[in-house]
Amino acid sequence: MVPAGVDPAAFDAFDMQALDAGTFDAAIDGAGDALAVVFFWGVDCFNCEIAKKAMLAQSDAIRALDLKWFHCNVYEHHQLGRRFGLHGVPTWFFFHRGKRLGRATGWHGLAQFQAAVSAARAKAAAAAIR
């Protein structure tokens, strides 16, 4: 559930599943072979709103990345912020088969986000070869 006053458009557009400490591990494991990404955000976070708007403005390119999306309000779920050592939001963590592959901190444009996704896919591919 999204708190009152938070625009859910990006969460809805990318079919992001909300996570908390109780659902996190099972949801990430349940993503299976998909490259999963968790969007960590906070209420009244200006940069989070900028990121969501930018993602919506380039929604076709974001969808083309073929990600399984999740989101977590770390202002509400502090334990996940601590677990992942977050010092600021927005932050995206990438997972494959339950393994953390990397992160992107701050929205620095589509090209940088695409590069982070590519790096995560390369790590997933390298792990599959071993």
Question: How should each PLM-predicted stretch be described?
Answer:
Residues 83-87:
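A short glycine-leucine-enriched loop at secondary-structure breakpoints
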Residues 25, 78-81:
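Short hydrophobic/charged patches on amphipathic alpha-helices used for structural packing
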Residues 45-48, 92:
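The canonical Cys-X-X-Cys-His
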Residues 88, 93-130:
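Non-catalytic, surface beta->alpha helical segment in thiol-disulfide oxidoreductase systems
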Residues 49-63:
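Typically the conserved alpha-helix immediately C-terminal to a functionally engaged Cys/Sec
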Residues 31-44:
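Short active-site neighborhood of thiol/selenol oxidoreductases, capturing the structured segment around
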Residues 1-34, 116-130:
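N-terminal leader/targeting and pre-domain segments
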Residues 16-19, 40, 59, 63-79:
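Thiol-based oxidoreductase modules, predominantly thioredoxin-like and allied folds used
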